Structures are given as C-alpha cells and as structure tokens.
Regions:
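Basic, short loop/linker segments at the boundary and entry of helix-turn-helix/winged-helix-like folds
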Residues: 1-33
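Short amphipathic alpha-helical "interface-anchor" segments enriched in bulky aromatics
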Residues: 2-3, 49, 305-340
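A short, flexible helix-boundary coil/loop motif
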Residues: 11, 244-260, 330-388
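Short, positively charged, Gly/Tyr-enriched micro-motifs
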Residues: 23-92, 203, 210
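Short, conserved catalytic/metal-binding motifs centered on acidic residues
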Residues: 34-35, 49, 68, 72, ...
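Active-site-proximal, Lys/Arg-enriched surface segment
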Residues: 73-156
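Electropositive, glycine- and tryptophan-enriched low-complexity nucleic-acid-binding patches
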Residues: 133-191
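An anionic, glycine-rich sequence signature occurring as long contiguous blocks
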Residues: 216-318
C-alpha cells in the first residue's frame, strides 16, 4: 500500500471513486479501500475479509471501522465503474511513463481480446445473467451464467489486463468485444499497435472497426472463412516454406499477402500458416516425444511492418491472456468468485481485481530485488502481504 501510494497516489485515486447513492452513510472510499485490501490479500470473499474486522489496521488505512460484508456488497453494486476504469488508466499512464511496458516483438505492443465465462448457476439469477438450456438425464434444465470480454496488453514479459465488458443477455461475444474495443481505443489510443484474437473474431465488422482506428488485427483463420482458407492452402502447396527454430519448436511457415477472397472485408488480407514440431521429454518414461500442430492466421498487417517470424510469435501470444491472464486471475485472484450477485457489483469487482493485479505486479517487479523475486513464488509474496 505504501509503495502504491508513493508511486501512483493510491489514496487520492480511491477518493475519486464515485457511486450512485443519494445519502450514503459510509463513504465510498472506505468501501473501495476495504475491497482493495481484500483483493490484494487474495482473501477470496467478503466474509473472509470480515473475519479480520477487529484488526487495528483498518483505523490506519480507512480512518474508520471495517463495514460488514453485506454493506460492502451493496456498496459495490452502487459503484460507478467508469471511475474505477479512470483509476486503472492513471496507473497505466504511470507505468508507461516509468518505461515499465516494453514492446513484445518488432517494437510493437499488442492488445489481446478474448471472452471468459466467469461463473454459472442453476439456482440463482440476476438481471445480467445469460441463459442456456442443458439436456440432462433428468430432462431439460435452465442454467444461468455470466460472461465478459477482457482486453489485455501483451508486452515484453507481462500480460497486463486493462478493461472488461460484461456480455449482455441476447448478445454475442463479438458484439460485446466491439463495444469494449471502442472504449479501449478511446481510453488507450496509443497503448498498442496490434490486436490479437481467436477464430471467433475473424469477422468483417470487427476487422473494419480496428482498421477504422488505424489498428491491424491478427486472428486465427478457421473453416468459417472457407474460401479464403482454401485459396491460401492451394498457394501454400506450390511454394516452399521458411524454416525457423524457436527453442524446442521447429516451424515451417508460409506467408502470403494480397488475398481478396474475403469479400465482406473489402480489403486485401495476409494469410500465414505455421506447421510446428515440438520436442517434448516425458517425465515418467524420459523418452523424447514430438507433438505436431498446424496454425493459420488472417491479418491486415503487411510484411513490411511485421516479418513472418515475429508474426507467428504474436499469433501464439494470444494464449497469454489464457495462461497468464484468466488462469492466474481465476486461480490466485478469485476473479470467478461471486462477491455479490448483481450485474453492477460483478463488473465492479472484476475491475477491482484488475487494479489489484496491476498494483501487485508493479510492486514485485519494480520494488523487490531480483533475488527476492526468484527465491519466492508470487503466491508466497501475496501471503506475506496478507500477513502484514
């Protein structure tokens, strides 16, 4: 907390958090400040936070007693989420100014867009729940669930979450992602050069939105764009691949531009194919095993901006949001926990988790010496923060 207050002016940022209550009895800065301690300590629930209510720490940090779990939940349900986004933008700008965020490859930083299902239930629902029907042995059952789309920066050595957008009932993931992308392009216009997405986003409206704002896209190419895929595969068979070695992975890459088979997009497309052979040593048998895979991407970025080798690295970089983003946020930061089953509260707690994640990684990467970072795991460091 002291580091975050010194570098980012955390106390002042917390005082700027707004809410929709008319006559609040407890200040929003007390509610958000308590939630931030819970998130940074990776406690995982408001009830766990309430267990340490009698600690003298709260008087020093909040200047007041800790509110109850129910009060904190109601407070987050009335919180102005745009004010949390403003706080995240301020922290990002400080990191950028301090040259913490460095390009991943070819002098570029990429924005990764992907969707995630945070939780589901067959018993509880709210106004923001999506609905689906499950065919079970006991008949058809209704299941409610929540999904959101997250935007993260892919920089050298770090995947930094920036924002999220809840998917509304009756809305598909790409429409939700486009709404998120419009806001990210407005809030972080110069933060990234390139957008990475999976095969679901290989749609003309998404590509056109990115091109309209001067951003190129790399997305997986699947059977949904069969004409483009067939044209590319036919030409690839007539040419020799470029060979690359990336640690234990051998790659045969084909890279061609000026495809016009995607008529809905209305511009030329670049297609890259990578057939890969990875050398794996089995832990049990100690034998060497080879895993083969094939990847195809469609993109609007020309070769003169991004060569084939770095293109493929960015294409695989999309998985950073799965491995270093959703995986860590869910398993260590309890991002899938329902603190309060209210659409506004779920969004607010999601943004709170993003803010805590950024502050925690800024602290361990910028304030701790390398020998400490290498000696202890992130989980252990988080537990030390909680103990203090």
């Amino acid at each position: 907390m002291k580091y975050s207050d010194k570098v980012f002016g955390l106390r002042g940022l917390i005082q700027g958090i707004e809410d929709k209550r008319l006559r609040p009895q407890i200040a929003m800065e007390e509610i958000f400040g308590a939630g931030l301690v819970m998130a940074l300590g990776q406690l995982g629930s408001l009830n766990a936070l309430e267990q340490i209510k009698k600690q003298c720490y709260w008087k020093r940090w909040l200047g007041a007693d800790l509110a109850s779990a129910d009060t904190l939940g109601r407070g987050f349900s009335r919180m102005n989420t745009d004010s949390i986004r403003k706080t995240i933008r301020h922290v990002y700008s400080r990191l950028k100014r301090n040259k913490v965020l460095r390009p991943a490859y070819a002098g570029m930083i990429a924005l990764i867009i992907d969707g995630h299902e945070s939780h589901r239930s067959q018993l509880r629902c709210c106004g923001g729940c999506l609905e689906r029907r499950l065919h079970t042995k006991d008949g058809i059952r209704r299941e409610n669930y929540h999904r959101h789309v997250m935007a993260s920066l892919f920089c050298k050595g770090v995947c930094l979450p920036l924002d999220l957008e809840p998917q509304a009932p009756g809305e598909d993931e790409v429409s939700c992602a486009m709404r998120l992308l419009v806001r990210v392009l407005k809030d972080y216009p110069k933060a990234f050069n390139l957008i990475l997405a999976d095969g679901l986003y290989t749609q003309a409206p998404f590509f056109k939105l990115a091109k309209k704002h001067g951003k190129d896209v790399i997305a997986e190419l699947k059977d949904d764009r069969r004409d483009l895929l067939k044209d590319a595969q036919g030409l690839f068979k007539q040419s020799k691949p470029n060979l690359y070695q990336d640690n234990k992975v051998e790659r045969q890459c084909w890279d061609m531009e000026h495809f016009t088979s995607w008529e809905q997009l209305g511009c030329e497309v670049r297609v890259v194919c990578s057939i890969e052979r990875k050398r794996v040593k089995r832990q049990k048998t100690k034998k060497i095993h080879f895993e083969n895979s094939e990847w195809v991407w469609a993109s609007t970025i020309p070769k003169q901006k991004l060569d084939t080798e770095d293109f493929v690295k960015f294409g695989h970089g999309r998985w950073k949001i799965e491995n270093n983003g959703f995986n860590e946020l869910v398993n260590y930061w309890h991002a899938d926990h329902v603190y309060c089953h209210n659409p506004s509260a779920i969004e607010a707690f999601g943004l709170l988790t993003i803010l805590a994640y950024i502050l925690f990684h800024a602290f361990i990467n910028r304030n701790l010496k390398a020998v400490i970072r290498h000696k202890y795991t992130k989980k252990h460091l988080a537990q030390m923060i909680t103990a203090e």
